[in-house]
């Protein structure tokens, strides 16, 4: 079935199918506009993509190419486009490049394809605004989101509008932006978790260390004796009777021993120097305690002669002076003698050490060398008797 036009072009089915198979993008995609208008619309659709449709795809699924619907063509435009295309086909002109229109209408893969070399550079944002402000011809759709997006100002859509890009490009950028916005938070969380792990490890180390220290202290306290334990007392030396008698005789002669005398006495008694020194210290303590008790008793009784017999003084007191003293003065003298006796004198030279004969006892001796019962009551001849 073939129809002839006024200009000699045929409208046969085989002619239309052959022209469709020859690679006309306008016929294949349902675009029946003239070739010049189709190219202009293609470049316009590439240069000025629908900003609102791209905005609607932010954070949602990529928009389907079906949303870019075409208005129903008018009958006279369809006839003109068919005649023009058939005339070009009979004149054996090379077919127009099908890469650019097909690329503009078909959905691209996820990765962005390179732009054709004949495409002009994308206009600046001012030109985009002016182009978008112009009335739309064939890129408008009747979807609810597109109709609602037409009322949005272009300024809100301009930051999201870029050059020719695939529908999947904007969600990738949005996902990258979201990932970059969450990256500092993730880094902060990672740093916090690392710090928490370090603190936990340090606390575990500290607890483990304190536990080990406690175990060491327990084991050391079990194995070794306590630090504040008293030193073991030395065993008391058991002296024999012979050793005690020799030590008592030596103490009656000398209350303080020199180093040489102590060593000689220790060698004679088969004792150590430390044992002899300890025995002398204990004996002097006992002697001073007994002397203090005796001085108190004699001072209370006022018997100064007995005090002189018990504790001879190196100083000579004339009997007349002793006879004129009362009991209070005698007690004071006894206290002075006691205090002088407790002063530890330096060890005299061994050659000078000899038993001193008490001078008071010599003067207190009676006729025949017998001690007088009351030496203060027997005055020396030629001295007045005190009354």
From Swiss-Prot:
Quote the cellular component terms of the Gene Ontology held in the record: chromatin; nucleus
Cite the record's Low complexity compositional bias ranges: 100-113, 127-141
- Pro residues bias locations: 114-126
Q: Which InterPro entries match?
A: HD (IPR001356), HD_metazoa (IPR020479), Homeobox_CS (IPR017970), Homeodomain-like_sf (IPR009057), Mediator/Homeobox_domain (IPR052145)
- Which residue windows does the record flag with biased composition (Basic and acidic residues)? 180-220
Gene3D superfamilies in the cross-refs: Homeodomain-like
Q: Where in the cell is it found?
A: Nucleus
Cite the residue spans of the region called Disordered.
Answer: 1-145, 157-240, 367-387
Its chief place of residence is nucleus
Domain of life, source organism: Eukaryota
Return any one Pfam family short name. Answer: Homeodomain
DNA-binding region positions on the chain: 232-291
Biological process terms from the Gene Ontology for this record are: amacrine cell differentiation; cell fate determination; neuron migration; positive regulation of translation; regulation of axon extension; regulation of transcription by RNA polymerase II
Q: Spans of biased composition, class Polar residues? A: 7-24, 160-178
Alphabetized GO MF terms: DNA-binding transcription activator activity, RNA polymerase II-specific; DNA-binding transcription factor activity, RNA polymerase II-specific; RNA polymerase II transcription regulatory region sequence-specific DNA binding; sequence-specific double-stranded DNA binding
Keywords for this entry?
Answer: DNA-binding, Homeobox, Nucleus, Transcription, Transcription regulation
Q: Does the keyword Calcium apply?
A: no
Describe its function.
Answer: Potential regulator of neural basic helix-loop-helix genes.
Q: Which family does it belong to?
A: Belongs to the BAR homeobox family.
What's this protein's name? BarH-like 2 homeobox protein
Source organism: Homo sapiens
């Amino acid at each position: 079935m073939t129809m002839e036009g006024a200009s000699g072009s045929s409208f046969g089915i085989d002619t239309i199918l052959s022209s469709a198979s020859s690679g006309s993008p306008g016929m294949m995609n349902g675009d029946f506009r003239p070739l010049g208008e189709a190219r202009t619309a293609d470049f316009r659709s590439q240069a000025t993509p629908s900003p609102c449709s791209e905005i609607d795809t932010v954070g949602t699924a990529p928009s389907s190419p079906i949303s870019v619907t075409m208005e129903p063509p008018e009958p006279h435009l369809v006839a003109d486009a068919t005649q023009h295309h058939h005339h070009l086909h009979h004149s054996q002109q090379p077919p127009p490049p099908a890469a650019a229109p097909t690329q503009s209408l078909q959905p691209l893969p996820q990765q962005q394809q390179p732009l054709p070399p004949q495409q002009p550079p994308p206009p600046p944002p001012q030109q985009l605004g002016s182009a978008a402000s112009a009335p739309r011809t064939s890129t408008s759709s009747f979807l609810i989101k597109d109709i609602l997006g037409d009322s949005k100002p272009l300024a809100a859509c301009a930051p999201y509008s870029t050059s020719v890009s695939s529908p999947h490009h904007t969600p990738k950028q949005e996902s990258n932006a979201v990932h970059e916005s969450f990256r500092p938070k993730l880094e902060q969380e990672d740093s916090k978790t690392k710090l928490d792990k370090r603190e936990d490890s340090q606390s575990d180390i500290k607890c483990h260390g304190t536990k080990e220290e406690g175990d060491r202290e327990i084991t050391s306290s079990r194995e070794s004796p306590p630090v504040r334990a008293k030193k073991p007392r030395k065993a008391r030396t058991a002296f024999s009777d012979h050793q005690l008698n020799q030590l008592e005789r030596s103490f009656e002669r000398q209350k303080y021993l020199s180093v040489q005398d102590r060593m000689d006495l220790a060698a004679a008694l088969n004792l150590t120097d430390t044992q002899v020194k300890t025995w002398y210290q204990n004996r002097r303590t006992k002697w001073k305690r007994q002397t203090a008790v005796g001085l108190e008793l004699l001072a209370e009784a006022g018997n100064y002669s007995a005090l002189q017999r018990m504790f001879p003084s190196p100083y000579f007191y004339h009997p007349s002076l002793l006879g004129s003293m009362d009991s209070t003065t005698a007690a004071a003298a006894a206290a002075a003698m006691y205090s002088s006796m407790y002063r530890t004198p330096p060890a005299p030279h061994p050659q000078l050490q000899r038993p001193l004969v008490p001078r008071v006892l010599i003067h207190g001796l009676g006729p025949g060398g017998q001690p007088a019962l009351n030496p203060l009551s027997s005055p020396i001849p030629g001295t007045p008797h005190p009354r």
